[in-house]
């Protein structure tokens, strides 16, 4: 059996947000992420679940270098990416993208869809013909029409805007996408469509996802493994079935009790 390829690793990740007191002395305001170890494999979806404020979005941003971690090590394809090495971070980020929670605020309201999709291509310094090819392909992958490229974000529904956000993430051909609660701001009727689209794209393109959410039913549907976060720590980790059928932590069982139809397996 072929060994899985580890694409991203994190060891001992900590993120502390500081504030200064009246005298200007720095003190801890929030210890958002504490001693987290995590591995992500090629073609895998790793689900991060937990209640609001548990640190899952902060952890995701630390892993992608969007937030500077306080402590810990990150490895991309086995090579350490030091937190102060901006060149290495940018090189890693060339292969990473993010899909934001709110499709309304994450798109520039003054740009057309074409301008939104061109923005991440600027660093690649492509020819106009190459840009055009990538834009057409990105629109096709998320089932948006060619005519949509000339429209502004306000002309679209929430689900369509999230498709634009997905196209923006895909256009640079990333290896990893952080899906930061990508369906929580959408109508329930649209959520399944977006999750199915993400699953199809993952299978077609071999993408690796970090999928943060508080909806455990959706996380189970899309994820291969799940990490349960509480107060900045991953308190339980495992494949979907072991987490759902035989949770070890009381906190995990509490989260699962809110899932319709969940019943703890006894014995």
Where are these regions (language model features)?
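Helix-to-loop junction immediately C-terminal to a conserved catalytic motif
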Residues: 64
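Conserved ABC transporter NBD signature motif
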Residues: 72-81, 92
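Conserved ABC ATPase "signature" region
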Residues: 129-147, 256-257
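Conserved ABC ATPase signature
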Residues: 152-156, 160
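Conserved catalytic motifs of ABC-family nucleotide-binding domains
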Residues: 173
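ABC ATPase "signature
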Residues: 237-238
